[in-house]
């Protein structure tokens, strides 16, 4: 069983959904970023979704762009990020760890050597935000070669054909978009996802985690009530980092409070 399968099985037994926070690795710097990831897990995160800093994150709103800039300004490189992820993997051997990133970063390293590096760091899944299913063949092949789950986005506008491809090609979990547009906590998630969840189930997709605009416990509860296996929250987490860059300990305390509250909302 993969780490994701084990996580979903464990949560099912407890009658809970998954809460998965997203952060950019090395935001605001490598050392604090490690403490942030540790705090997220210790406060109840079921898995981590991580970004590798990139100068042009297309699908992201200003909050996550800011995280990328802070990380790059601190001297972050993909290698430093992989090192930090490797340390988290060593500390939490059962934690599912996913990357959410852009194709340029994969290309710049060479597709195969990128996935090989992921496997070495103990990463479970990779979602490439700007690669749709119909352009994904070489990424999926490399992912499978190195035992990494390829993750795909199921957008609210998706045709049945796209949802079928997402279901067949994806592994680990399915990233279900609550709305179109860029990421951000300002624009709340819409929740008419029942139809999509029905279709994904019909096509036997990996469990769906709802993302984009998830910033409060009530939305986590709603996502799970609608039939999602859990929720992903990125911009709301990164906003806490942004607000307390000068107060590292307060930042960790606030992140801990946020994650605990979001995780509590996953109880069915």
UniProtKB/Swiss-Prot annotation:
Record's function text: The alpha subunit is responsible for the aldol cleavage of indoleglycerol phosphate to indole and glyceraldehyde 3-phosphate.
UniProt-listed InterPro entries: Aldolase_TIM (IPR013785), RibuloseP-bd_barrel (IPR011060), Trp_synthase_alpha_AS (IPR018204), Trp_synthase_suA (IPR002028)
Catalytic activity annotation: (1S,2R)-1-C-(indol-3-yl)glycerol 3-phosphate + L-serine = D-glyceraldehyde 3-phosphate + L-tryptophan + H2O
Functional pathway: Amino-acid biosynthesis; L-tryptophan biosynthesis; L-tryptophan from chorismate: step 5/5
Keywords: Amino-acid biosynthesis, Aromatic amino acid biosynthesis, Lyase, Tryptophan biosynthesis
SUPFAM superfamilies (UniProt xref): Ribulose-phoshate binding barrel (SSF51366)
GO molecular function, one term: tryptophan synthase activity
Subunit composition and interactions: Tetramer of two alpha and two beta chains.
Protein name per the record: Tryptophan synthase alpha chain
HAMAP family: Trp_synth_alpha
Active site: 49 (proton acceptor), 60 (proton acceptor)
């Amino acid at each position: 069983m993969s780490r994701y399968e084990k996580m979903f099985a464990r949560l099912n037994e407890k009658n809970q959904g998954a809460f998965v926070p997203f952060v950019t690795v090395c935001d605001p710097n490598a050392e604090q970023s490690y403490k942030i990831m540790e705090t997220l897990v210790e406060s109840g995160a079921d898995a981590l979704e991580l970004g590798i800093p990139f100068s042009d994150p297309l699908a992201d709103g200003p909050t996550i762009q800011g995280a990328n800039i802070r990380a790059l300004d601190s001297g972050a490189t993909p290698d430093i990020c992989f090192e930090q992820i490797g340390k988290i993997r060593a500390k939490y051997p059962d934690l599912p760890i996913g990357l959410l990133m852009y194709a340029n970063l994969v290309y710049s390293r060479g597709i195969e050597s990128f996935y090989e590096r992921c496997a070495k760091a103990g990463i479970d899944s990779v979602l490439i935000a700007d690669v749709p299913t119909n352009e994904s063949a070489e990424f999926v092949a490399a992912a499978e070669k190195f035992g990494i789950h390829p993750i795909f986005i199921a957008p609210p506008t998706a045709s049945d054909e796209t949802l079928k491809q997402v279901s067949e090609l994806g592994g680990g979990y399915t990233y279900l978009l609550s709305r179109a547009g860029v990421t951000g906590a300002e624009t709340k998630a819409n929740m008419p996802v029942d139809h999509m969840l029905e279709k994904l189930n019909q096509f036997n997709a990996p469990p769906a985690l709802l993302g984009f605009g998830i910033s409060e416990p009530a939305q986590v509860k709603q996502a799970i009530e609608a039939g999602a296996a859990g929720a992903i929250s990125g911009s709301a987490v990164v906003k806490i980092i942004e607000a307390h860059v000068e107060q590292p300990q307060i930042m960790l305390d606030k992140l801990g409070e946020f994650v605990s509250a979001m995780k509590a909302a996953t109880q069915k």
